[in-house]
């Protein structure tokens, strides 16, 4: 079995990717002739962004979550009690983390840090974690020299790489036979194999041993999860990891799943488990409070009744994706701002994707570049003015929040990224007007902006008040290899997940079709190639993360968060447009189910 199984089944089945976008936007509609196989004549397909006003509407099913929490009561006094209980436990957990002394202290602290990260608790102890890892990394080779436990080595490696320390992958050579293969005896250690699998997802382009480790661990974990030899809770944990690895999963999803797993582990720490449950219960109540605020805000806009039925409100779904960057309680306002920005992005994308004519797209995007209606706006249907006004209102809401805090710079920079994102919709439409299928490189040049990854990162930075905003946005605007790789991953994921839906709707201007047209490959081959590109670009992103030492970790994490939400959104098909499957399960576990 090749590593590709980690990134999803063969073509024809729902995708199951490791480890995020577009989390929030689907692939552009049919804008080019269908020439996916060389040697065949082009088949002209009607454009979504055409001059015609006879436009078929692709109706989307209503979201079950629109009014779901309308009558839910959130007891603020109960939240106060939870906060007090959490604060009372923090000193004890801090003592657990820092009390380890002596030769094995780095090992013990690293294992404890992994627990804190997995349970969603690490943000409480950022300073302690950073100090522990900084001190420990200076002597890590000496400390692990005689360690031969697979779980311990893999977990330590995962922790240091996750926090930006370039621990050598050579540590895994101790687990190989003389013939160069991993020891067969390791297969019996289910927890060790799972930890090896997780560590392998932090590999770079030169960590060849981690490529081998991923193949070895993936193949054997499938058998371990299915043969009934593992406890049921461990089998479930393995299946969750095989669906999306921890490194590429949203932290809050990992926390929900890990709390349930940890509770069933023999010898778990009761105080730590209680701390994790209290923390999640507080977070869950905050999320419900925020969704109620956002739902009311959206209804007050009165936009849905004024738009053709190509668009549906997905406020709760967009709030869910905002937790990819901001899952911690202290970022409540940031989640609200990010959700409003997501709604503004989604509306532009759906308008250009599913309904607008070319002239309407041109007018809308030109107006957004000016941040004022262009001369042609009055000649178009009223719905276009509704779309434009909603976007401006969303940014005005953000301005009301940020300007009094002296954070106008962040707002303006996010607005500029939004304009660039919006313009990419028009750029794709203009390529269509040329009447030629673009090269895959031309498509990606526009598609990396159109997918929305950069504006998502900009919106994430806008929600942070503890960073150097000028430095952070300068890094984003530099379009570093690290940032570019995050956008590329999201683009590939979106193209893979949305391909069948795009083709059903007559949309052929997809990345896969551009690639097939340029290289003369089949659908099966292009799916395989795109999965490889996802895997390779993930390695590049990991590599650039370790190299980028002059940018704060919190800033770099915004790119990872964007990609993670892409993996979650596209894990089983186009989960944003059609969230009724896995996304609904995530929403239920996060907003409804009690822990």
UniProtKB/Swiss-Prot annotation:
Cellular component per GO? cytoplasm
Q: What is this protein called?
A: Putative terpenoid synthase 16
User: Required co-factor?
Assistant: Mg(2+); Mn(2+)
**Which gene holds the coding sequence for this protein?**
TPS16
> Which residues hold Mg(2+) 1?
349, 353
Compartment(s) where it occurs, according to its Swiss-Prot or TrEMBL record: Cytoplasm
Q: Does the keyword Transport apply?
A: no
Q: In which pathway does it act?
A: Secondary metabolite biosynthesis; terpenoid biosynthesis
Could you tell me one molecular function GO term of this UniProt entry? magnesium ion binding
Q: What is its main location?
A: cytoplasm
The record's keywords, sorted A to Z, are: Cytoplasm, Lyase, Magnesium, Manganese, Metal-binding
């Amino acid at each position: 079995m090749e590593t590709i199984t980690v990134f999803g089944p063969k073509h024809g089945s729902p995708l199951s990717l490791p480890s995020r976008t577009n989390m929030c936007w689907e692939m552009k509609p049919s804008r080019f002739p269908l020439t996916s196989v060389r040697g065949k004549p082009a088949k002209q397909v009607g454009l979504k962004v055409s001059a015609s006003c006879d436009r078929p509407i692709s109706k989307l099913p209503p979201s079950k979550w629109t009014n779901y929490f309308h009558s839910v009561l959130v007891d603020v006094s109960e939240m106060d009690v939870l906060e007090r209980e959490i604060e009372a436990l923090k000193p004890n957990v801090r003592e657990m983390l820092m009390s380890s002394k002596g030769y094995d202290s780095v090992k013990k602290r690293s294992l404890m840090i992994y627990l804190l990260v997995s349970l969603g608790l690490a943000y409480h102890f950022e300073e302690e974690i950073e100090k522990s890892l900084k001190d420990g990394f200076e002597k890590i080779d000496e400390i692990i020299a005689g360690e031969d436990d697979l779980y311990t080595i893999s977990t330590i490696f995962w922790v240091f790489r996750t926090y930006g320390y370039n621990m050598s992958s050579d540590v895994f050579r101790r687990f190989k036979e003389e013939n160069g293969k991993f020891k067969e005896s390791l297969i019996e250690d289910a927890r060790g194999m799972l930890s090896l699998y997780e560590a392998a997802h932090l590999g770079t382009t030169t960590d060849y041993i981690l490529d081998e480790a991923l193949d070895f661990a993936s193949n054997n974990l499938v058998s371990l999860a299915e043969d009934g030899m593992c406890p049921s809770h461990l089998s479930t944990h393995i299946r969750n990891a095989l669906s999306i690895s921890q490194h590429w999963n949203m932290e809050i999803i990992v926390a929900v799943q890990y709390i349930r797993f940890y509770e069933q582990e023999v010898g778990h720490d009761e105080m730590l488990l209680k701390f994790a449950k209290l923390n999640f219960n507080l977070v869950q109540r905050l999320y419900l409070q925020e969704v109620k605020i956002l739902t009311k805000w959206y209804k007050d806009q009165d936009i849905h009744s004024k738009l053709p039925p190509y668009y549906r409100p997905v406020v709760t779904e967009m709030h869910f994706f905002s937790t990819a960057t901001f899952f911690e309680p202290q970022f409540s306002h940031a989640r609200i701002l990010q959700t409003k920005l997501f709604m503004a992005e989604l509306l532009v994308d759906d308008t250009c994707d599913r309904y607008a004519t070319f002239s309407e797209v041109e007018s809308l995007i030109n107006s957004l570049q000016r941040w004022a209606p262009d001369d042609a706006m009055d000649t178009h249907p009223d719905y276009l003015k509704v779309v434009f006004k909603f976007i401006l209102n969303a940014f005005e809401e953000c301005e009301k929040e940020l300007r009094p805090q002296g954070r106008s710079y962040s707002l303006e920079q996010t607005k500029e990224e939004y304009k660039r994102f919006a313009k990419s919709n028009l750029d794709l439409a203009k390529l269509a007007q040329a009447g030629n299928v673009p090269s895959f490189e031309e498509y990606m040049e526009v598609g990396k902006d159109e997918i929305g990854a950069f504006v998502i990162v900009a919106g994430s930075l806008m929600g942070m008040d503890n960073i150097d905003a000028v430095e952070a946005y300068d890094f984003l605007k530099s379009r570093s290899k690290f940032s570019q790789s995050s956008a590329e991953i999201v683009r590939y994921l979106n193209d893979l997940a949305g391909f069948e839906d795009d083709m059903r709707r007559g949309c052929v201007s997809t990345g896969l079709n551009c690639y097939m047209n340029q290289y003369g490959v089949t659908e099966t081959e292009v799916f395989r190639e795109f999965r490889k590109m996802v895997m390779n670009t993930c390695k590049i992103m990991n590599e650039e993360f370790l190299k980028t030492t002059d940018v704060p970790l919190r800033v770099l994490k915004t790119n990872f968060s964007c990609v993670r939400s892409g993996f979650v959104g596209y894990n089983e098909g186009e989960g944003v447009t059609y969230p009724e499957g896995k996304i609904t399960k995530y929403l239920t576990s996060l907003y409804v189910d009690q822990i």
